[in-house]
Amino acid sequence: MTRLRIRRHRDFMTPLLRVVSVVAFSLAVGAQDFEPKPDATVFAKFNAKKAPTTQGLLLRKDDRLAIIGDSITEQKMYSRILETYLTACLPELKVTVRQYGWGGETAEGFKNRMVNDALRFKPTIATTCYGMNDHKYRPYDAANGQWYRENQLAIVKGFKAAGARFVLGSPGCVGPKVPWSNAGSEAMNLNLCELRNIDIDIAQQEQVAFADVFWPMLTLGWKATNQFGENYAIAGKDAVHPGWAGQVVMATAFLQALGVDGDLGTFTVDLGTGKASATGGHEVVAFTNGELTLKSGRYPFCAPAGELSDDNSIRSGMALTDFNSRFNRLRLVVKNAPAKEYKVTWGPGTKTFSGKELAEGILLPARFAKTPFDDAFKRLDEAVGTKQNYETKQIKSLFHGEEGRADMEATVALTEKARAPLAAAIREALVPVTHTVKIEAVN
């Protein structure tokens, strides 16, 4: 195992985010260094190289993030999760996002529009997710792998030359039967695994971050079908385009590659002294008689209701990926709680916890299905969705339509005027939330 270190300029951000001047990528080397496999014969032929890991936050304040990919990106699901998360859960970064999904696209296709569509807006950081169309829904062959490698490498080099940081995402996996392919799913997934391994080679060569979409999706999809039945489709009902659960797996891969820590703050209450404190973008307004009132500029990630057995449920994907413990750690700690049990009311919900549990700390988003942030989070998320929908129209229909062919620069200027209020609506939707946590001893 070797470590390659990339020097970064010093950034001044909150201690919560642990922003450092050096971002290190732990890069696995050696042909024998592979990801562990589940103990099942279906994985026997797979040799997934050990994925590099990002250490330290790759994002910087005021970053301009480009999220790039094919029709899976154009679904505007994982891209929406990412933008909403970065806006709501890491508000101090003030990251802005553009979504560039294009159905049917390969890495070569984006390479050819990279300058006109993306680099003109001077992104400071970018993520890509290609390989699904590049693998051509057939078994792997070396010539196609080399074609993929050359185009992926050209994209990485193009963004690096423009001064942008980069996250190279692997393709995902396919499900049991792709309707438009006669190749078996095993052959296609072995092909996609090879393209994933090529992406790792490029990430190591170019010293950029890597987002492993393929291996978690393949292994967690297998786990989910064992738990919920064969109808659970991590790769989507058409075996290619994931529903919300699979999209959460994708978003999780990119959050990990971006070096997101997931600590969203802690509320600490001392019942013995009657004092309370809060960290991470939360302010104590009052604490009396066991009732803590807070004002929060940082939101937890709030998912709509959904069954864990539903592959089109965000909550299902969050459970599969341990999302709450990894990226949604908003905690309540109660000290000097002598009673055996306590009722905790947060927003519309009330739960009972032991004094020991409260002393150790509880993860609020994991324990409360409904939160005081839900309505504000939904408004913000809807604003993100509206903007991303327009970005698809802006690029596909206008930049590459009659308007763009007639006068590209005028089209850019006019569409940017239309996009500006949609981007502003996201910022306006992010408002502080005042909420209470009530702690009562159970007699």
Regions found by a protein language model. Give the residues of each.
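Alpha-helical cap/lid subdomain in secreted, periplasmic
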Residues: R7, T54, L58-L59, R80-T96, ...
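N-terminal pre-domain segments of enzymes
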Residues: Q32-K61
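Catalytic nucleophile-elbow at a beta strand-turn-alpha helix junction centered on a G-D-S/GDSL motif
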Residues: D62-M77, G103-T106
